[in-house]
Amino acid sequence: MRDRVAMMLRPLVRGWIPRAVLLLTVAFSFGCNRNHNGQLPQSSGEPVAVAKEPVKGFVLVRAYPDQHDGELALALEFSQPLAATQEFDTLVRLEQGSGNHDGGWSLSDDAKTLRYPYVEADKHYTVLISGDLLAATGSRLGKSRKEPVYTGELDPVVGFASRGSILPARGSRGVPVVSVNVPEVDVEFMRVREKALPAFLARYHKAGQRSSWELSNQGNSRKRLSELADPVYVTRFVLDGKKNERALTYLPIQNIRELREPGLYFAVMKPTGSFSDAFETAFFSVSNIGLHARAYKDKLFVHTASLRSGNPYKQVDLLVLDAKGETVLQGATDDNGNALLNYTLNAGHVLVSRNGRDISILPFNQPALDLSEFAVAGRENPWFDVFAWSGRDLYRPGEMLRISALLRDRDGKPVKPQPVFLRLKQPDGKTFRETRLQPAEQGYLEFTQKIPSDAPTGRWRVEFRTDPASKEAVQGLAVRVEEFLPERMKLELSSAQPVLRAKAPFTLTADAAYLYGAPAAGNRFTANLAVAVEQHPLDNMPGWFFGDATLQLPRGAKETIDITLGADGHLVHDIVLPEEAKPVSPMAVVVSGSVYESGGRPVTRSLKRVLWPADALVGVRPLFDVASGADANGMARFELTRVGVDGKPQSAKGLKATLVRELRDYHWRYSDGRWDYDFTRRFENKETRTVDISSSHTTTLSLPVEWGDYWLEVFDPVTGLTMRYPFRAGWSWGDDNRGLDARPDKVKLALDKTSYRAGDTLKVTITPPHPGKGLLLVESDKPLYVQAIDANPSTTLEIPVTADWERHDVYVTALVFRGGSASNNTTPARAVGEAYVPMQRKERRVAVGLVVPKQVRPAQSLPVTVSVPELAGKQAHVTISAVDAGILNITGFPVPDAAAHFFAQRRLSVDAYDIYGRVIESFEGGTGRLKFGGDMALPPLPQAKRPTARSQTVDLFSGAVKLDAKGNAHIQLPVPDFNGALRVSALVYSDTRYGQRDAETVVRAPILAEASMPRVMAPGDRSTVTVDVQNFTGKQGKFAVKVEGVGPLVVAEAGRSVTLGIDGKTTLNFPLRALEGNSVAQVRVRVEGNGSKAERHYDLPVRAVWPQGLRTQAHVLNVLAPIAFDPALAKGLMPDSVNARLSVSTLAPIPFASVLQGVFEYPYGCAEQTASKGYAALWLDDATIRSLGIQGVTPAQRLERLEGALGRLASLQTTNGHFSMWGGNSDVNPVLTPYIAGFLLDAKDAGFAVSDAVLQKALNRLSEDLLSGAHLFYGNDQSEALMFAHQAWSGYVLARVNRAPLGTLRTLYDNERGKAVSGLSLVHLGVALSLQGDRKRGEAAIEAGFAKSEGGRPEVFGDYGSVIRDNALMIALVRAHGLAKPAYEARVMALGRDLQARRRSGWLWLSTQEQVALAQLGRALLVDQKKQVSGTLYVGKQREDIAASRLIGRSFDAAALARGVRFVPQGDVPLYASFEVAGIPRQAPVSDDSQLLVVRRWYTVDGKPWTPGPLKEGQALIVRVSVTSKQNMPDALLTDLLPAGLEIENFNLGETRQWADVTVDGIALSERADAADIKHEEFRDDRYVAMLQLTGGRTANLFYLVRAVTPGSYNVPPSLVEDMYRPALRGTGRVAPAMVTVVQP
């Protein structure tokens, strides 16, 4: 009988029955077809029409039981949506009065269905529905009704109740199974082969539901289950449980003889009679061995303990298996259950412990124990250390970065002098510069680097290494590069309330003052208040969630204060919390306060307090990865606790924990010209349990979940509050290596001292969560001390402190083990305690005296005196920094502290693993009965070109100064013309001792004159210069104030006279107007009186709000005749913006000069653009600059640009030799690598220092691509053509250095040339063949290339090319390598005619690739040109005789054009002349949406559309720019200039918490990164810039925040989007409104 049943079960479990049924069905079908017609009857039958009366009005459609996955609810469906504000519990009741629950009836998302979950199965209910029930339309139901509903039976369900894999051998009742209405289950057991353990555990980490496909699939190089495990037993169990009740039953596997052999078993279970493809699975080993392992650098400490008693388990055999199942290490534990093995951790290995029939298995691919609740964080502890510091951590582009550092060992002691290698990394993680530093006296290092003016903004990093090849940096320092203005004021917000209570006001205290020492008397102060659900109200409980995360609160901040400060700048104000802040959940209440300068620019600070709705709150800690979610078809596990405001646990009785599932009903809708889907939500209560919590322990809750979205609700009857925690199950169903079940219980450790030294005795008091045997360890990167302990509450133990503790990564660790017993439902467990052991280093910190004046005047020396008596007579140094406090306050930069760094706590360098988190739990439940059984079974984006103002930043540094014999130093620092406060900080160091001190000095002139104005202006803007004048001369007086504009600025009412008393202050407003111009203007302020004067100069850029245009004329001179510049070319352009150029050449009119200068000044910097700018710098030598008449390019600029390009390309190179477009995670396009490698070769040939490592890596990459033929362009529509182009260009570059294999080039020509779609690729291949010696094939390929180019080329196929780029490069290449022919030369004229035609259109857009190709062609043409041109140039009456040259070029401004420009040529005709005028039009360009639709919209801070009107000073707006492209555009660039009176809120610097929850058209600002594919974005002084990828037909949404700052009326610029490599593809947005006005409040 047993064998027969076993044979019946096997096909069921393995999924054979469905296949068998299918085969029988097919067989019968074929059998019927033997007689073609057989006895086939005639078609008959008439449809029966079922009359369906339409539902009219508001009525009850049906009342029914709604059951899903074993959970019941009564459901009432109505014909129309219900009014949601009704009291459903009053209007709808159960006739059984005792069954009614307050808040029981819930309304579905579509508002048509009411659900009531508090019902039982197999029971009759009567629902009483009041006739007063209202529809959303206002209709009444009209008549009360009684509706009977029978709930019926619950659906059958069964599953393993534990995710554990260790079944205690003693005192266990078996494997727990939870079931509903399942009387019997069939279970198959398989034993995993020992050599297959690593492979099995790599695939099956956890119990859960699996399909037959998962159990038998061999995909992804995985073995089938049958190859890992052998079937050993199959049986049927009878389960406990009453009908319609959830039951827990233990499967008594310990009684089965076939499962007694030591090993790991895999169990597969299904309900008897079920034909589903889903199986419940679990794996386990039966053991009494509790296994705990601690991994050090090269050691593994193992402790084995009895799972029954917690006592040490001695003489346990240990072995480590590698991924193939081979034994790599053997050992055994001693009589104390301990073993120390020489072993380095490997995640693919498995530790097996065995003693007799007991076996426990520990895979190292599981997470280490989670010790996040212990203070074990810190940096690593290598053999040497570097303390790096700077005067500040915030810099502007273009400033000098200065870094100091000290080289020491891990304890701050000297090391042998040796070079240190420094890397400066950009925000994208790429290296900008790498250099070697040699320590000076006492290990001092210093590094300086000018930050390029076009540097990418963001967080830069300085890293230090002793080995330049090391991937990991030992130490580093982060600095921020942003466009900022130093603050002029300081603001402190505080509150005496540690937490807030409902209905009580929030008492805010604000103190504001100017940094130069005066209170903010009469200044405006505003405050906004925002509330949000606070799920983490206690900082000391990370990972715990409180409150109701589903609570809907108003988004955005509301203004609560707008007042003028008193004479002392002090304010105390009670803020009434909004009505929405009801005491139903903890809430974060964030006040953002701003004090305003007289000119309107705010200084903002934030203060947060938490509103507690009750004295105690219930919290939940998910025992799974919060980001990934719980496992689908498994158990979602949680810990529950209840804590007070002080964070101390409190007990709780009768908590109601409910698992709620969110269901979504999807439906399609047609909108915006396409189909999309939407959904309505409804919720089902899956399970409700009553939970008690003690004050000393948390409670664990395990709930079965499927795939989908859930809430865990916990109702506290004492407070009446409900905690709701939403989570998802099955989000990362394929990731089994996750989960927080490794989080241990906590042992409290208390040390008797704050620090120790060798020779001391450390006393530690242990308070375990449960008594038990355990271990006390002292650890660093190895075990220093181990002792067995009996842990009881308040156990105190002593440990001797030895010399090897003298380091900063020493921890005391306590392990306490608890035995388990089924009789009292106790599961074996371990608890962990960690305490850092600080070493005594007080004697190595020295006291520093720092004397500075309390106040100094600008433009004088600041005397600094440092005294360190403890270092008298010893060698020591000091560095002094004096930095504007207005810079330091922006980021809260702390005073550098070397002692705090060197003696800081290092992280715990131990990873611990054990099996206790996977012990199968003991629950209350019955035992299953065996029915039968058997033995067989189953970018940076540098700033756009613009006039750039200089911003004064004060950062003074002394360098390393030696202390004299008395330990003193006297230093003078030159203070610039500046009013404010300097934080003066001293850092003192000797060989082993350190100290620091800081003080503040006010810098203030006798007459203080500070002006505020916009950061930028546009022609036609009207604004205000606000001047604060304060009298610090010590006597009353009359003061003359004069303000004037230099450049395109006009200041009205420029002269004033004021009388001020002692310390008196006044604020004057001067109207300011910007004229036409495109330059850096100045505002100059002069104040005189009482024998003193103050002069201040402020740069103020004036720039247009739209881009420049290009106008050209071209002439072919067939006779020698004078030519003149037509002044009409500059008509309608702003004179200051005009840049005109005359070019006369004996060659075809190639715009050699303009393209060279254009690409040299190109503002952006991806890999391609960087190489292109490098080419321009390379070719702009002195002779070329003189010949072309190019202005504004000095040799120093050329060298800086070239070296910058080489450095940036090095930072963009990836590990495989290709180049990242923008760095970081941006795309790598292999097509660019040969172009960049060619530039590196050209720069090297020209004598510049090119990194050989970068060049060789690039050449090696090209060689691999050429030889392997590996396909690199999958997904491209013309991938084969692109691959051919890439290989051909690679071959050409390699052939230049004789590294292109001739055989490979021949094969490419013979077999692949038909794939070419551009002539350039064939020319590249032809030149490469010729250089490598096969001139015949080479010339044939070149000829074929020129022939193909006559037919054009695809507009886009991924090579950044165009007809102009390809033709220019082809001609330049054959000329450069002596392969030119007359037919090829004729292409020059055709190219010139094409460019002339473009010029005549009025706009000549050229990509950087086209500009470089034209420049290269121009150079090639000039090399062999014999003809020359000379002549006389007249500018007005001024005459210049120009010597003969192949090309003559001169540049002019608008004034020269107005005087008249005429050239009289001499030479052989024909000659070619071109006139070009670039400038900014006076009239705004017409919006253009032919290729790109660009729409800018403005919103208020609560996410509502802004109605245009005057903006109050300080008012903030959200800007949304929507971009829709008609075609794919992977390299789009958005430039959104700001109106002058508005300033952008830099999300990298400002407080963003108050904006995080704001939603604009359904998009939360906290999720704005998902609204567009942004590769890089920057917040600049006057613009928002983003590089993004656009998909044809889809809309990208970009957001940023602006604030109205300076009163005035300002032009609104249009938004501009362009394709960086196809400049003709661009879109200009409409401007609405055309002007923005900012007014004072």
UniProtKB/Swiss-Prot annotation:
It is found in: Cell membrane. A lipid is attached at C32 (S-diacylglycerol cysteine). This is Alpha-2-macroglobulin. One of its GO terms (molecular function) is endopeptidase inhibitor activity. It comes from Xylella fastidiosa (strain Temecula1 / ATCC 700964). It is a lipid-anchor. Keywords: Cell membrane, Lipoprotein, Membrane, Palmitate, Protease inhibitor, Signal, Thioester bond. It comes from the Bacteria.
